[in-house]
Amino acid sequence: MNTINIYTDGSSRGNPGPGGFGVILMWNHHRKEISKGFRLTTNNRMELLAVITGLEAIIKKELPVIVYSDSQYVVKAIEEGWLKKWIATDFKGGKKNKDLWTRYYQLSQNINVKLKWVKGHADNPFNNRCDELATAAADGKHLAIDEWYEENKDK
């Protein structure tokens, strides 16, 4: 059976600061790169938004998906069950990024997705390319607004 592989990375220049993400989708000899930059955000938001963006870009949602991320925050939250606990308690205790986690959770209900951790800044060419995309997006002009973050950062 064919598997869709998604490599992701997020970056921020300062935490918070300008940030961006990079995504590579690969399936059956096809490859697509996606990136976007934001004027004020955090590295964790960009890591998670990269995963969400990759999943949202999938056309063949019936195929199994493996997402490779160098973010332990994202991989552990999903694979070790933290996210299910956060959802069950409505993010009590000040868990951050509720908007993105809720978006991921809703999206993941209709996709057979597994996350795998990869070491960042190492020898994985796809992760390294995602890092290039993310940092270039963060350094770009005309950065988008991470509206939820900017409205809620001081709460």
Mark where each language-model region is.
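Extreme N-terminal starter segment of soluble prokaryotic enzymes
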Residues: 1-5
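RNase H catalytic domain
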Residues: 8-15, 52-129, 133, 138, ...
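Short, glycine/acidic-enriched capping/hinge loops at junctions between secondary-structure elements
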Residues: 17-19, 35
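Short beta-strand scaffold segments in enzyme catalytic cores
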Residues: 20-27
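A short, polar/acidic, helix/strand-boundary loop motif
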Residues: 29-46
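Short, conserved alpha-helix that lines the donor NDP-sugar binding/gating region
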Residues: 47, 51
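Metal-centered catalytic cores of metalloenzymes
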Residues: 146
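Short acidic DE-rich linear segments
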Residues: 149-155
